[in-house]
Amino acid sequence: GGCIFCSAGGSGDFAASPQQSVTGQIAQAKLLLREKTNCRKYIAYFQAYTNTYAPVGVLRALYTEALAQPDIVALSIATRCDCLPPDVLDLLAELNTIKPVWVELGLQTIHEHTLRFIRSGFSLAQYKQAVSALHARGIKVITHLILGLPGETTDDMRASVRYLAAHPVFGVKLQLLHVLEGTDLGTLYKNDPFPLFTLEEYCDLIADCLALLPPEMVIHRLTGDGPRRLLLAPQWSTDKKRVLNTIHRQLAGRDLWQGKYYRNEEFHG
């Protein structure tokens, strides 16, 4: 059961302790952020697991507790595209009139054979339906794509990016495939290692992806963080500054920028 690449933390390996109240978790996260940055405003991110999978009354209490804090300026809710029933959509639309509400959907790929392999449990059609329902209610969508899934070529990955570019998506998180200890993907990798991106290959692909996306689309993530204690591969991904610097060099060296090849079918990578 569950997706093939998810750790026991349900993609929330860096989140505050879920045993605390929402207010307590936000306070803990603020302390951590203040050590690194000088930020004064925050986005409340409901990240781990499926954050719309509860009775609507429970969800209302959790979301409004977060939104009630004056320095919380937006709510970002990560969930599955098949866990957005009408009553939850109506709640999100209502809260969106108070402060901006974003919904994050983990599509990962548009290719059905890969969706089956990673055990996503939903289809591309269900994702499209969820985006339409959210868009109709004025709720912004952030879509996650994973680059480097086994069995996919770079052309397959660029096709997923082109698909997002053609749909009403506010933002995107481009995520390098991390192979983690304690996941089914990790077991597969240890038994029969499959090819993973080198730093240069990944940054080359990211430059392509940025060129294909609309200039107004918000890029929320370019690589992602795998928890060091669980990360089997690729180890180069732990040096985030080096990754970002390499992406900048690729863009400059190839004279690329976000949107350069948007709607230009002459570009095929």
Show the residue positions of the predicted features:
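Canonical Radical SAM [4Fe-4S] cluster-binding loop centered on the CxxxCxxC motif
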Residues: 1-21
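Short microdomains enriched in Cys/His and/or Lys/Arg
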Residues: 20-35, 235
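Alpha-helix N-cap and loop-to-helix initiation/capping positions
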Residues: 21, 54, 58, 118-126, ...
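Short amphipathic alpha-helices and their capping/turn segments at secondary-structure boundaries
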Residues: 29-33, 84-98, 129, 158-168, ...
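Conserved SAM/AdoMet-binding glycine-rich loop
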Residues: 36-122, 126-130, 135-136
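Short, small-residue-enriched loops and turns at beta-alpha junctions
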Residues: 50-54, 81-84, 148-152, 180, ...
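Conserved C-terminal portion of the radical SAM core fold
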Residues: 125-184, 200-225
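Auxiliary Fe-S-binding modules of radical SAM enzymes
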Residues: 171, 179-269
